Every structure is written in C-alpha cells, then in structure tokens.
Amino acid sequence: MSVRYQLVIDCADPDRLARFWAAALGYELAPPPAGFAAWDDFYRSIGVPEEELTGGADRISDPHGGGPAIWFQVVSDPKAVKNRLHIDIHASGDRTDPIETRKKRVDAEAARLVGLGATLTVVMEQEGLDHYAVGMKDPEGNEFDIN
C-alpha cells in the first residue's frame, strides 16, 4: 500500500520559493482549507504563534493531482551544506530522442528557470555517454537538476 506524502523545504522566504517552484513545476499555489481566507488564518486557528506566520503563500500542489504537495517551512538557520534530497526536473523528453534534441530542451528549461531566479551551477555531460543534465540552485541556494 502506498501512502500520501508531501515534501517540505526549509527556507527563509516561503512565499518567494513557493512562487518559484510553482512556476518551475507547473504547480499552483495551494488554496487554504475550506472556511479560511488565507493559510495564516488556518494556522492561527490551530495555535501557530504569530511570529511563525509568513503572511504569504507557503504551499503548492499539482493541479492534476499526480505529484506531491510541497510545503515551504520557515527556518532561522541559513542553508549551509549540500541538500541530502533534491528535485530532478525531467525536461529532455524520451531517451529515444537524439541527444542534441534533449540537450536543447534541457538548456531551454534551464534558461527559463534562470529567468525565474535560479542559478546554473554545473553542466553534466561526458563524452560518449547518452546523458546530459545541468545542476542548478533555486533562489535560496537549494540544489536541483534538470535532465
């Protein structure tokens, strides 16, 4: 039996990262639970202290229901080391497509995400291998790959 889950990303600015990742993944900002005008209203109702409220978006969801929800949680500690878990965005298409076609797709997606605030950190390509990917960082420095 599978279980439902959500990913949680620690960050300094949940609204900024929620908007970045919603655009990156084709997700939507998740609406607050029924009966609440905003997530902060819901959080207040369950006793979350005012100083922990973000005043903006902090959750995103797949509009088609296939992917996990992602919650962006405020933490006071800055990111210091490489992520132990990261997101891979599959933009290259089918492996039966020519490598040059797949490279163009990956590079186009990387350029789009740079326009949203990401940073390109590394190109992963080895002579003779049928693989091409790029390493990137989101606006707060969390690593992810596009392949």
Q: Where are the regions that the model predicts?
A:
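Hydrophobic ligand-binding cavity/cleft-lining segments
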Residues: A12-A23
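Vicinal oxygen chelate
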Residues: S2-I9, A23-L25, P32-A34, R44-L53, ...
